[in-house]
Amino acid sequence: MLDLSNKFGYFHINIDQKFLKELLISAARDEKPHCNAALIKYLGMKPVPNKNYCYTIYGWTNCDKTIPLEKLAKIARKTACPSTVIESKIISIKAGQHGGEVKPKFPIKIDGKLGSIVGHILGDGSIDSKFKQVFFSNTNKELLKEFANNMEEVFGIKPRIWMQRKTIAFKEKTRWERRLNSINELEEGKSCGLFYPATIGLILNEIFEQFAIGKSKKIPKFIFELNKDFKRGLIRAFFDDEGTVSIRGRHIRLFQDNKALLEVFRKLLLEFDVRAGPLKYYIKRNKKRHYFSIHAKNNFRKFYNEIGFVSTKKLMRLKELIE
């Protein structure tokens, strides 16, 4: 987290007060860091007029005041305390004093849960290009719950849940009917939107090299260097959102307008020894729609054993293809 201070110095951090006080004492080499002129100057702050102390520094350790990430990083550089220890004491983060509060579990693990979050954002989700909030929409409660559970596990926050009013696809704008208390309240056949604060979107885009900015999506090259658990979660989530399983056609098929994105997923599948066919396309609403297909029982079996689906419907169809 401290590594992000150059870009997100304005993030406000709620950190264990006792620990922060000890950190400040260590940085100032003074039992009263809020009175230490050298520390006050180093942090680019000013003392109270005609006084020899800084009320803001005092407030960080005595008045439940959040501390800007930029200031916390500067304090850390004055001490020998490892960044991992400091991050373990962080309680919550906000993008500014009034942003939505999130409670990440540091260090953020590169695992299947994070891979699934990224995969769903690349699929039926997004990170708003202007306001940076994370959004995921689906009609499948299983996928909605998976995304919500993983976000809570990684970032310690529950979503704002809205049910979408039925509209004519591609002709009418999305309209939100009402806010829900639980995904279980979603009415059959309707879509549900999960909304999360900008803090998460900013962190994810920083980690994954601006992989999702509005409708512009990509997979950074370093993904191939990450562990298989992450890749498995990434592929599964994307196939749950964008893939189909056909009993009659005897194939698994992945659709996407973004040709480059499909090429990356074809290559990622090879790491699980699943071989997909070449990219093809068809024209829909005067626009190219790209796809590739997976055939053959040995590929179906490998996909089932190594990747699978969260969607019960797709998983059952895949079982039929194997049998």
Cite the ranges covered by each PLM segment.
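Internal intein/HINT superfamily modules and their associated LAGLIDADG
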Residues: 1-323
